[in-house]
Design a protein with these regions (language model features):
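Hydrophobic/aromatic residues located in beta-strands of well-ordered beta-sheets
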Residues: 3, 95-96, 250, 283
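Residue-level recognition of beta-strand->loop/alpha-helix junctions
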Residues: 7, 42-44, 219
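Residue-level signal for short, function-critical loop segments
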Residues: 9-12, 72, 102, 206, ...
């Protein structure tokens, strides 16, 4: 079976080609690992995105199942894409799936509204019900395992934003799943640098356990529950990016590197990797200030 995954445009950004969306590339990698054929349409920075989609659906090798990711400001474009596919390919589109941060957060909020019998608000519930009209399946939370059932299910919602869900990734699953399928997109079109060195983003940890009031994800287990990859899996990905793309800059896009108890050992292994290849990397990442220690600082400085 072939599935087409789509990254909608983000014209609200000053530059749409800074960091590629790794989440949907992780899903693509999971599909490829199970011998699915995957097409990726990256519409970041593409103004004539409908024309691009039209060209794709007129190919003989087009997919019949489509998966779209969307942040909140991308949702209007995701809806337009979904409607276009269904209108242009009536009977040929078996399913259009929506995942990503927006539907996850709205579903989380809708569950909280329902628990209060919708006293005070039902805005999130209305949003989710509206999305159900446009998409065949909504995937909330981790998509790497949920995608397989999303392709075949008759349910409208797959709730992977639940620690008891079979789709909610454990530390071990997060470590052994394949790295993002970056080969499916034009990585050279993404421009980010650290001290003048071209860099790519890497995710070593999921989740943030803190309760900052400004954060819309604080009620979502998917965004709150810490899941860390093994040091070995992170180093393997970094080494692969260096060998494949010649990448010497790495942006660790974790919420806080130093909630990972293995952070110091990971920094030490990054040192060893640079010594192995005789190269100097440029690294960047976020830390939680009140958790920051001298030992962590020394390890980061060495790396």
């Amino acid at each position: 079976m072939k599935i087409c995954l789509i990254i909608p445009p983000s014209p609200f950004l000053l530059d749409e080609r800074v960091f590629v969306q790794l989440g949907i590339l992780k899903i693509a990698a999971s599909l490829e690992q199970q011998n699915y054929s995957v097409d990726m349409i990256d519409l970041s920075g593409v103004e004539n995105y409908i024309d691009v989609l039209n060209d794709y659906i007129n190919t003989s090798t087009r997919a019949s199942v489509f998966g779209i990711t969307a942040t909140t400001p991308q949702v209007p474009y995701a809806v337009k894409i979904g409607q276009f596919l269904k209108n242009k390919m009536p009977g040929d589109v078996s399913k259009v799936i929506l995942g990503g941060p927006h539907v996850t957060l709205m579903h989380t909020a809708a569950k909280r509204e329902a628990a209060k019998n919708f006293v005070g608000s039902n805005r999130a519930h209305k949003d989710v019900e509206c999305l159900k009209q446009y998409f065949d399946v909504l995937v909330c939370g981790d998509g790497e395992l949920a995608i397989f059932d999303a392709i075949t299910t008759n349910e409208k919602v797959i709730d992977a934003d639940n620690t008891k869900s079979e789709y909610f990734l454990s530390h071990e699953q997060f470590s052994v799943l394949p790295p993002p399928a970056r080969h499916l997109v034009d990585m050279s079109s993404y421009k980010y640098s650290i001290e003048g060195v071209p860099a790519l983003s890497v995710i070593a940890q999921l989740g943030c356990p803190f309760h900052c009031t400004f954060c819309s994800g604080r009620n979502s287990p998917f965004l709150r529950k810490i899941r860390t990859r093994s040091t070995e899996s992170v180093i393997e990905e970094v080494e692969s990016l260096y060998l494949t793309y010649g990448t010497k800059g790495f942006m660790f896009y974790d919420d806080e590197l130093n909630v990972n108890k293995n952070m110091v050992s990971m920094m030490n292994e990054l040192c060893n990797l640079q010594e192995k290849h005789g190269v100097d990397f440029r690294l960047r990442g976020f830390v939680k200030a009140e958790l920051f220690t001298d030992k962590q600082a020394e390890a980061m400085y060495r790396a």
